[in-house]
């Protein structure tokens, strides 16, 4: 694939850069199409991205419809058929600014002013369209073979909410139509698995703008799943000596100044509330509260390790564009814990946390994940606590422990928490990009800030080390992950309704009610569908909408024999004695069998 660089030379494109160049060129072709249809359009930035491209554009008061996006895409195809040559040129600063001013490219002019040290600027031209760009690009527009405009959204100029809101138009581009078709198939699968779609169908959770964006509410069915997850992880933690606590959802601003959140994390926090001369804030994390619980009484080395756990309500200000159902909201419940230990106990505590993570993943059949050692960016003094010695010690300690434990990991700069390095376990969901579920963070910073101590064997006071860890991450995100992995077909122990009783007709309603009562007595979550509908409709509703693990189809034959006809989600049926069926289901519940 031939590409042209800003100095005008043409060469073969390195294979690992092909998609980037294709997508960057697609952004220019889209901008040209927009300019033809909307001559007053004023363009900001239009880069290639990991999965496609976008362009931010100021369209004045014009609001684009889906039909408008289709027209832009149609014009893009016209431009590719014109097979316009893509040619670079370079201008000195004064001429470059004049060119952009003449073309009414106000955002480009402002951007050039920001690049005060640049003496010249490069441009690429195709037909009548000119864009300031460093390239490289395809040599002709006809080389752009497969693309699609996907959506529009809002974006602030320079990502600053004080600036004008622009229209961001997104698209995708690939080498050929086959790759685009494969992407569209993947997108269809993503839509079918989307936890927001399934959550609505199953009545798991809801959102309402009157309540607030990013503030989902769990309905009875969804809260049942949520409670089962809570019970599961608390049992695991209790078996490992965790002590569970409950702390307030707010704290004073001074609390977060002490912890450092106010200096390093304030942009992710909600504004402070003033009450009786004191400032309070919704908590984004639970660390400060747990530090105060440890500080509540004196400690000896004999008390350590001390493991404090909580299913805690947290609140973070997320921009509206990043919100996604229960996967990412402004309120969530974190499976949080803080482990206070001596330096000598770091290895064993990290090992126990890792074992708990991997044991949990095995229970939920999670196999596609990778471990990342997230480190600070030493150049970013604003984001991270400024103590080089502490950071070097903490990063080396966690790196050594993970290496000794034989855990394969990669390292990523700039992804640490502000107070210390961490192990992130990133999962690859059924569709979409990977994200972090579990974390284990090593912290020498907060214990010192809160003046935490313990009396060591030699009688001297020392500062404990703290491990911050979350196994399920937030229960909300973990539930979203499970919904998309299973398409809502939860294993029996997690399912909101574990058995649905379906009487064939009114004649077997009394028998169905008796069976329902017996299942309830056995501790099974059961629902009786006594609607006056045909049995085929009832089966489809239970199987395809409610995704119930088991359906009992009860007709005259079953009522007479005193047994049940069992139908599972796969459509397989068998006849069983009532007690036999109850034993099967209760065993799956007790053992938390992962069958879906």
Q: Whereabouts are the PLM-identified features?
A:
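Conserved P-loop NTP-binding catalytic core
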Residues: 45
């Amino acid at each position: 694939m031939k590409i042209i660089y800003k100095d005008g030379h043409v060469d073969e494109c390195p294979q690992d850069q092909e998609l980037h160049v294709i997508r960057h060129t697609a952004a220019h072709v889209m901008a040209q199409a927009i300019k033809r249809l909307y001559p007053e359009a004023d363009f900001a930035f239009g880069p290639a991205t990991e999965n496609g491209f976008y362009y931010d554009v100021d369209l004045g008061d014009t609001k684009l419809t889906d039909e408008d996006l289709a027209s832009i895409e149609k014009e893009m195809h016209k431009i590719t058929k014109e097979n316009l040559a893509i040619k670079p040129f370079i201008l000195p600063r004064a001429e470059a600014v004049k060119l952009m001013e003449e073309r009414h490219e106000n955002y480009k002019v402002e951007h050039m002013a920001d690049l005060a040290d640049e003496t010249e600027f490069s441009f690429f031209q195709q037909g009548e369209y000119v864009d300031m760009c460093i390239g490289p690009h395809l040599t002709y527009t006809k080389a752009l073979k497969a693309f699609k405009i996907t959506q529009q959204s809002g974006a602030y100029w320079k990502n600053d909410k004080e600036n004008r809101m622009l229209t961001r138009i997104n698209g995708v581009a690939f080498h050929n139509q086959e790759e685009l078709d494969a992407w569209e198939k993947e997108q269809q699968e993503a839509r079918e698995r989307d936890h927001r779609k399934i959550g609505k169908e199953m009545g798991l959770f809801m959102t309402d703008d009157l309540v607030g964006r990013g503030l989902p509410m769990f309905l009875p069915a969804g809260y049942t799943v949520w409670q089962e997850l809570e019970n599961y992880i608390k049992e695991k933690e209790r078996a490992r000596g965790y002590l569970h606590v409950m702390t307030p959802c707010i704290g004073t601003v001074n609390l977060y100044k002490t912890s450092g959140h106010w200096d390093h994390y304030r942009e992710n926090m909600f504004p402070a509330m003033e009450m009786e001369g004191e400032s309070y804030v919704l908590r984004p994390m639970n660390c400060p509260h747990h530090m105060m619980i440890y500080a509540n009484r004196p400690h000896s080395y004999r008390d350590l390790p001390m493991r404090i756990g909580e299913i805690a309500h947290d609140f973070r200000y997320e921009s509206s564009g990043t919100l996604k159902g229960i996967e990412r909201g402004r309120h969530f419940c974190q499976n949080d814990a803080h482990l206070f230990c001596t330096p000598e106990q770091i290895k064993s505590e990290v090992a126990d946390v890792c074992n708990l993570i991997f044991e949990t993943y095995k229970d939920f059949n999670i196999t596609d994940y990778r471990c990342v050692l997230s480190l600070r960016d030493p150049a970013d003094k604003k984001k991270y606590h400024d103590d080089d010695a502490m950071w070097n010690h903490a990063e080396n300690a966690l790196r050594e422990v993970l290496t000794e434990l034989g855990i394969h990991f990669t390292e990523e700069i700039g992804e640490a928490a502000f107070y210390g390095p961490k192990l992130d376990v990133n999962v690859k969901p059924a569709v979409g990009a990977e994200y972090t579920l579990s974390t284990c963070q090593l912290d020498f910073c907060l214990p010192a800030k809160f003046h935490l101590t313990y009396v060591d064997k030699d009688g001297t006071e020392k500062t404990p080390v703290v491990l911050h860890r979350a196994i399920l991450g937030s229960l909300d995100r973990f539930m979203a992950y499970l919904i998309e992995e299973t398409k809502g077909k939860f294993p029996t122990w997690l399912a909101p309704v574990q058995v649905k009783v379906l009487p064939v007709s009114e004649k077997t309603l009394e028998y169905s009610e008796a069976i329902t009562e017996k299942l309830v007595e056995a501790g099974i979550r059961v629902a009786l569908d006594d609607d006056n509908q045909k049995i085929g409709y009832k089966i489809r509703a239970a199987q395809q909408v409610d995704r119930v693990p088991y359906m009992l189809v009860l007709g005259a034959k079953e009522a007479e024999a005193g047994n049940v006809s069992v139908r599972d989600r796969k459509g397989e049926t068998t006849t069983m004695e009532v007690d036999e069926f109850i034993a099967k289901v209760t065993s799956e519940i007790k053992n938390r069998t992962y069958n879906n």
